[in-house]
Every structure is written in C-alpha cells, then in structure tokens.
Regions:
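Intracellular loop-helix junctions on the cytosolic face of multi-pass helical membrane proteins
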Residues: 1-19, 147, 175-306, 310, ...
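Short amphipathic helix-loop junctions that connect adjacent transmembrane helices
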Residues: 42-65, 305-329
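Central cavity-lining transmembrane alpha-helices of secondary-active solute carriers
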Residues: 65-86, 333-346
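Conserved MFS/SLC helix-loop-helix module at the cytosolic interface between two early adjacent transmembrane helices
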Residues: 79-113
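Cytoplasmic membrane-interface "Motif A"-like loop-to-helix N-cap segments
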Residues: 88-100, 352-369
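C-terminal ends and interior cores of transmembrane alpha-helices
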Residues: 101-119, 366-385
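Hydrophobic core of transmembrane alpha-helices in multi-pass small-molecule transporters
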Residues: 106, 117-133, 386-405
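Glycine-rich segments within core transmembrane alpha-helices of 12-TM secondary carriers
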Residues: 151-171, 178, 186, 191-197, ...
Length: 486
C-alpha cells in the first residue's frame, strides 16, 4: 500500500507544539482509536472464557485464545484492504473516516448485543475498521509536511506518542468499567472513547490538505468491477464454510492460518515470476523469505501478551497492590509505557550510529534471541503460587526492547526490498508475516497451562533463540541477496 502522498506545504501558523494544527486532530483520533482497540482487546479474552456467573460467555479457554489470535491476525490482513481502499478507491481521508465509524459501531455492538452474536458482529466491524484506519492514518500525518520539512520526523514521533497514550489508558479505564459494571460497561467505555475521537475528527477533517481527499491511483472501471467481485467471492466462500459447519470458532485459527499461508505463497510466487521484476529485485524478494519466517516467529511470541500472558495474568499473578485488587487486563498497559520511554531513545541511537549500525538481518536475529530469553524468565517463577507483578513487568520490558529493535525496521525493509512495480504486494507480504505470527499466538496457547508452563516456556525460548542464531549464521548470504539494501 502506498504511503507516498505528501500533500501541500504546511501552513505558516503552527499551534500544536510548533507543528501544523491538524496534527493535534490526528494525534487525538489515533489516541482514542488505540484506547478503544486495546481497551476492548484487553478484556475480550476474559469475556470469552469467564463463566456466566462472572459475566462471561463460558467458552473453552483454548477456543477463546484461538479466537483472539485469529481476530488479531484478521486486523493485520485488513490493513491490506485498507491500503487498497485508500490508494485506489476512496482516498486515504475517507477511508480513515469510514473506518473510524466502523470501529465505533463494533464497540457499540459489543456493549449492547449480548452473547456470541455481539462478539461476531463487534469483532468483525472493529477488525475491518482498525485495518483501514491503521493503514491510512500515517498517510494523513505525512500530508501535513513537505518531504524536506525538518519537523516531519518529530511530527511522527508526536503521533506515535498519541498511539501509545491510548494503548496505555485503554486497558486501565475499560478494566475499571469491567470491575465496577461488568464486561459490557467496559466495552461501552471503548465505544465512548472512539466516539469522542470520531466527533472531534469529523468537525475539522476538511482542514486536511486537499491531496488526502483524492484517490492517488484510481481503479479503472474493469479493475473496480474485478475488485468488487473478488470481495463478494471471499464473503460467499466464508459464508459457505460457516453455513456448512466447516469453519467454527474452535477451528477458526486453523482456517485463518491457512488463508495467510496461501496468500503469502501466492504473493511470493507472483513477484518471483513476474516479467516486470529485474534479477536484482527477484534476488531481494528471495532474501525476504527467511526474514518473513523470522518476523512471523517473533510476533508469535510477542502477541502472546493477548493470549498466553493474559491467561497467566489472570491465573498466576498477584494483582493485589497496596491493598487494591486490580484487573488482570492491566498487563496490556505495561508495554506502551516502555515504548513511550525508550522509543525515542532507540530512534536516536540508530541515527547516531548511522552507517555503523547493525544490518537489518542482525537486528532481526538479535530481536529473536532477546524475546526468547524473555520467555525463559517465566521459568524463574515456576511453581510459585502467587507471582509478583514485577516479574511480568520485567518480562514485558525485555519484550519491548526486542520489539523496538525489529518492528521499526520491518516495514522499512519491506519498502526497500520491494520491486518497483510491486510495492503494494510487498507491503501486503510483510503484513501477512505479522498476521501469521499473531494467529500463531492463539494457535500455540492451548499448549500452555499451569501444569505445562515449564516445558511450554522452555520450548518457546529454544525455538525462538534457535531461529535467531540460525539467522545470524546465514545473515551474510542473505544480505548479499539483498543487492545493496542494508
């Protein structure tokens, strides 16, 4: 998906920390979107597997973690659809606006519609909306600055702070709502947050640069028809699978994993065999194969903070702090704190090192080894009846360090390795690796229990560290295949 729209020159009058005034608007809408997204996701798993007397649906715990993993994967797949809509059909601004409406509608469904129907409708709307908003928000931020504006990087840093502020506050407030009024009050607070962001955005959206209100490379009539038929075909196929009972909540993660795998293979084959791809570009696409696998392995562990770690937080952690019994979903507020604190530090570090910084393959390798070691920290608390919250803080701190090493370079690498005629496909390929890791976080969860935590965390560390070491051993030939890309 193209993020090349830059828009008009910024106005001289700056009213938001020396930046264009509309940055405050985009900061706020993204903050509220992340507030609602992480706030809802933080309590959703408990809503799924808690028994009815606790306000939940009473699903099997393994089924619940599988649904969460599949849902998270679909969100990343929807970023591909959102990018296409923004680039080719609606334009980035309208795509973001309609996506925000969809997110709000999803949270309202979760708060008002009881039972499984509310979950299905709500999660589907939130997944589609989040994908559209996630893939177009940065385009709108970029449109506020010219390409050579020295404030550009600082503007994205401020925007990034907004994202993590929302991710920090969301679980805190929805957890409070859950504690005092049940799950549906928590979902309702997520809906209110998204509504607040949507209202303030709608009032000033026309002040954005003209470029984001237009379609950069519109579909031709035939392309538009084929796109519509493809979407209808996907909906029909999924409807048939659901109607015949072949796709159920219990095996949803397997279907999603299969779709992602087939899609990734198709994208690789398409780019490797295309006639408009040069030999250098083909070599770069081939070099992305081991990095695609490494990226999927990394996110398979990292995203377990919404599956395995959420269950661990509920069953193993002592959330009684200073005499107050806190909600287990607060585990999801820990990572954003570290990102805000250390994100700018890592950015400055890479800038200072310049050409002396490690090549991308070594960064991937280091991130895998570090997150594998983070999972081994769980072993120190094996057999402890009530684990101190400080241990999960330490584990997530180490996970965040790994994320800050690998996450920023992932998208950048995909854009640098992409064939000129297939940039959208390469970005789609990158997001399939994140989606694969996310669905794996749900697929792996049934192997975890209080009784199996030692072998589980041991093997998670072994597999991930081994993958990192293997990537380190082959990093020179992989870098050579990148043909000059670092």
């Amino acid at each position: 998906m193209s993020h090349t729209i830059t828009g008009a020159e910024p106005k001289e009058t700056n009213t938001f920390f020396g930046h264009p005034r509309m940055l405050a608007n985009l900061f706020t809408v993204e903050m509220w979107e992340r507030f609602s997204f992480y706030g809802m996701q933080g309590i959703m798993i408990y809503y799924l597997y808690y028994t009815a007397d606790k306000g939940g649906l009473g699903l099997d715990k393994d089924m619940a973690t599988g649904v969460i993993g599949a849902y998270g994967a679909v969100v990343y797949l929807m970023t591909i659809l959102g990018g296409i809509l923004g680039d080719r059909l609606l334009g980035p601004e309208r795509t973001l606006f309609y996506s925000a409406i969809g997110i709000m509608a999803g949270h309202i469904s979760l708060s008002l519609i009881p039972g499984v129907p509310g979950v299905v409708i709500g999660l589907l709307l939130v997944a589609i909306g989040s994908g559209g908003l996630k893939s177009n928000a940065s385009v709108l931020v970029g449109s506020l600055y010219s390409d050579n504006d020295p404030r550009r990087d600082a503007g994205f840093t401020i925007f990034y702070i907004g994202i993590n502020t929302g991710a920090l506050l969301g679980p805190i407030l929805t957890g409070w709502g859950w504690s005092f009024g049940g799950f549906h009050l928590g979902f309702g607070l997520a809906a209110v947050g998204m509504a607040a962001g949507l209202i303030q955005y709608a009032l000033t959206r026309n002040n954005l640069p003209a470029s984001v209100h237009h379609v950069g490379t519109p579909f031709t009539g035939a392309q538009k028809r084929n796109f519509a038929l493809a979407l209808i075909g996907v909906v029909v196929i999924i409807g048939i699978l659901l109607g015949t009972g072949l796709m159920t909540a219990d095996n949803l993660k397997n279907w999603v994993m299969g779709f992602i795998f087939i899609g990734a293979i198709a994208l690789f084959v398409q780019m490797l065999t295309a006639k408009d791809v040069t030999s250098d570009e083909r070599s770069r696409v081939t070099a992305f194969i081991p990095l695609w696998i490494a990226n999927a392995v990394f996110w398979a562990l990292y995203q377990q903070q919404f599956t395995v770690m959420a269950v661990y937080s509920d069953e193993r952690l002592n959330w009684n702090i200073l005499g107050m019994e806190l909600s287990p979903n607060l585990i999801n507020s820990i990572n954003p704190i570290f990102i805000v604190i250390f994100g700018a530090m890592f950015s400055a570090l890479w800038t200072k090192w310049g050409d002396r910084q490690p090549v991308t393959t070594l960064k991937f390798s280091a991130a895998l080894i570090i997150i594998g070691l983070a999972f081994w920290i769980f072993l120190t608390q094996a057999g402890v009846q009530s684990v101190n919250v400080g241990w999960i803080v330490l584990i997530l701190f180490v996970c965040t360090i790994a994320e800050l090493i690998i996450s920023p370079v992932g998208i950048s690498l995909a854009t640098k390795l992409a064939p000129k005629a297939h940039r959208v496909n390469m970005m789609a390929l990158y997001f399939t690796s994140v989606a694969m890791g996310t669905v794996l976080s749900g697929w792996l969860a049934p192997f975890y229990s209080m009784e199996t935590e030692v072998p589980y965390f041991t093997w998670m560390g072994i597999i991930t560290i081994a993958t990192g070491v293997l990537l380190f051993l082959v990093h020179k030939p992989v870098q050579k295949m990148m043909r000059g890309v670092k």
